[in-house]
A protein has these predicted regions:
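Active-site anion-handling motifs in enzyme catalytic cores
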Residues: 2-394
Length: 394
């Protein structure tokens, strides 16, 4: 499944090349998820020799984007095929990121269940959780997670949800791995194509589609809300606005255009149409003066670049990140146009104070995110020790 590598170190731990599988929402559909995977891979490779297999929705995209040793088409694998693939691993990682919620938990936990069946250790890596209302799903999540080797969540709300459904094993609160992503600079030509030029004040917006992870979104409400906000910043701040799609396959583009269609000043708005990597979007946000948005990793990227932002939380994972950087805001369904415009106006007036606050807290969040890899490495070292004792080190 994966190519073996040779290492000259004399220690068993360093000779051991761990076959690690990573299962999550991968395959180029969401730039936030790809940022998580990129950061995870970089940390693992910097820490221990590993051969990586990613369970993905798009094998070609994952191999090209991340350069891993192997990728498997998770949606096409039968249960027996998936079991055989998992059985070849030394460690299975679920995550990073992702949400355990009623509609998606069965599929999300399949490889974890198979790993337990074949005796492969499992780390659940920086997930979020909720809503979990279905009793069958609650039981599945509880029984599955109580039998993993390491369990980390990226926000306190996720820990509360898992504790509420009866998960008894230790749950470590860390942070989203994407906060460790490095920017990938853009050329001047690509910046101009994105509507960014020297001397222009740019405000970035993020729009997402409704769906199981965002059950409270009222499309008409939030389209009008963001259209009013975009018109407001154009007039109030003498700015241009860009809409940054984080999920192209799931209609971020269409919803961005729907917001623009409701704007009075639509001629001052640009919807990004080019393909960007996660690192390029991170770099692009560094050229903006303010950000307003819904998607978690859009807000994380803004914070990493020290760009003040006004968040519109639609789910616990977004609220959890906002809480981690010491900011508070009402949930999207409770926000009126007046409330949002007042929040933007106030945030803009205090943007330097807000920028300082974000840049002074993001380092602590990054430290929390590094705990994920530290725990993964501890688990890998334990596995290596067990392999050495049984003479199974390759």
């Amino acid at each position: 499944m994966a190519h073996k590598r040779s290492h000259k170190s004399p220690s068993n731990r360093q000779r051991f090349v761990a076959r690690v599988g990573i299962s999550g929402s991968y395959g180029g559909m969401n730039l936030g998820d790809e940022a998580i995977l990129q950061a995870m891979i970089a940390q693992l490779r910097a820490s221990r020799p590993v051969e990586l297999t990613v369970f993905t929705a798009d094998v070609g995209d994952t191999l090209k984007r991340h350069g891993v040793e192997a990728a498997l088409p998770v949606r096409d694998l039968t249960r027996d095929e998936a079991r055989q693939a998992v059985a070849q691993l030394d460690l299975l990682i679920l995550g990073g990121g992702g949400i355990l919620y009623d509609a998606g938990a069965d599929a999300y936990l399949r490889e974890v269940t198979l790993a337990r069946e074949v005796g492969v250790p499992v780390m659940v890596y920086a997930i979020s959780a909720g809503p979990l209302e279905d009793e069958r799903i609650r039981k599945l999540v509880r029984e599955t997670l109580d039998n993993v080797d390491v369990l980390t969540v990226r926000d306190r709300q996720g820990k509360r949800v898992l504790e509420d459904i009866g998960v008894e094993r230790d749950i470590v609160v860390t942070a989203d791995p994407a906060v460790l992503l490095e920017p990938q600079p853009l050329t001047e030509d690509r910046l101009r194509q994105a509507g960014i030029a020297e001397g222009k004040r740019i405000i970035a917006f993020s729009v997402r589609e409704p769906g199981p992870a965002a059950p409270d979104i009222d499309v008409e409400h939030y389209h009008l809300l963001l259209a009013h906000a975009a018109d407001f910043v154009i007039d109030r701040l003498e700015a241009d606005v860009i809409f940054v799609p984080m999920e192209r396959e799931h209609r971020d583009l269409q919803h961005s255009h729907a917001v623009v269609a409701k704007m009075r000043r639509a001629q001052r708005a640009t919807v990004l149409k080019e393909e960007y990597t996660s690192g390029e979007v991170l770099a692009l946000l560094g050229h903006c003066e303010f950000a307003i948005g819904m998607r978690l990793h859009f807000l994380i990227f803004a914070a990493l670049q020290g760009v003040p932002f006004a968040p519109l939380p639609y789910a616990s994972k977004v609220a959890g990140f906002i809480e981690s950087v010491g900011m508070g805001t009402p949930v999207l369904k409770d926000v009126s146009a007046g409330t949002l415009l007042a929040m933007i106006d106030r945030s803009w007036d205090y943007r330097e104070k807000l920028r300082h606050h974000i840049t002074s807290t993001i380092g602590e969040v990054q430290g929390q995110a590094r705990k994920n890899n530290e725990l993964a490495v501890q688990l890998l070292d334990r596995i290596a020790g067990e392999k050495a004792r049984t003479g199974a080190v390759r």
